Amino acid sequence: MSKYNFCAGPAMLPPAVMKKAQQEFIDWQGLGVSVMEMSHRSKEFLALTKKCEASLRRLMNISDEFEVLFMHGGGRGQFSAVPLNLHQENKSAVYCENGVWSKSATDEANKFTQTTAIDVRNDTDGQFSIKAVADWQLPADASYIHYCPNETVDGLEIFDVPSHPTAPIIADMSSTILSREIDVNQFDLIYAGAQKNIGPSGIAIVIVRKTLLAREGLPKPGILDYALEAKQGSMFNTPPTFAWYLAAEVFQWLEQNGGVKAMEAQNIAKAELLYNFIDNSDFYSNKVAKHSRSRMNVPFWLNDESLNSKFVAQSNEAGLLALEGHRIVGGMRASIYNAMPLEGVQALVDFMAAFAKENS
């Protein structure tokens, strides 16, 4: 029986990448040692890091105007790093909130800098949506504008990119990076924890415009200092080498399978399959307006919530793993990142249909 992992993160990895990692685990490149045992400053590992960055630059069309950093701390580490690096005296950092993670970013930034929070959601009788970007009412002056294009808990995705005449645009793309094509030049800093579309947890990708590195910001730990990490080649201290290795393998897999354009087409097909089933069911429901629905994270509710435990238990028995919703919102959630095949979503839909028939 095939098993499909719908966990929000750490998430499913491409089976081909997992198999290659297994084959190379104790003997990488014929060197007789694991990549986990290699010096991060060895010529072999340095070659891997260069290959990894070049692959990501090709996948996302990242120009030389940006540095690409591989940092510790995941997304939450960047919640601290962004204000520490980009703070400006007598200016407020604007945080556009559309769910749990964007609110968490605001809360962390409040420890270091002045913030202005803007709720960019609509709530119409319990149905949530994202306001048009033109209606966000961003202030005329700000140290930076921060937003999260995809909220994994709430299942809300923002497809348009905000702009500002003077303030840099910062995006937490932890759950949407590499899932759809974007124009990197519309942003000044993009960060992403790896554990959804890139690899295992333990590393964060930061794509930062070089001109931003000149900002003094606030006193900060070296491992959160963008300018220092750029100068040191992301090796101010020992990096998470195995996570970096697996990120390189995932990037190679993406390039071999049509790149971001192909991933986007597949992700649209997967999301449409699942949402269409939910919308045409009187047993399940979703609380997000169609134009604001996440392609990566699909929360849904059983109309009879007394069946929740039974649904989770039987879905696990059917090889459909980690479907229980986030504790904050309840219900169910299917996270369908790049590595999730269409067959996995079809298996979920088939199970949901059978469960509804059995329990109606």
From Swiss-Prot:
User: What keywords sit in the KW lines?
Assistant: Amino-acid biosynthesis, Aminotransferase, Cytoplasm, Pyridoxal phosphate, Pyridoxine biosynthesis, Serine biosynthesis, Transferase
Requisite cofactors: pyridoxal 5'-phosphate
Q: Name one GO molecular function term.
A: pyridoxal phosphate binding
Q: Can you list the GO cellular component terms from the UniProt entry?
A: cytoplasm
What EC number(s) are associated with this protein in UniProt? 2.6.1.52
Q: Does the keyword tRNA processing apply?
A: no
Which reaction is catalysed here? O-phospho-L-serine + 2-oxoglutarate = 3-phosphooxypyruvate + L-glutamate; 4-(phosphooxy)-L-threonine + 2-oxoglutarate = (R)-3-hydroxy-2-oxo-4-phosphooxybutanoate + L-glutamate
Question: Where located?
Answer: Cytoplasm
Question: Which protein family is it in?
Answer: Belongs to the class-V pyridoxal-phosphate-dependent aminotransferase family. SerC subfamily.
Q: How does it assemble?
A: Homodimer.
Q: What is this protein called?
A: Phosphoserine aminotransferase
The record lists the organism as Pseudoalteromonas translucida (strain TAC 125)
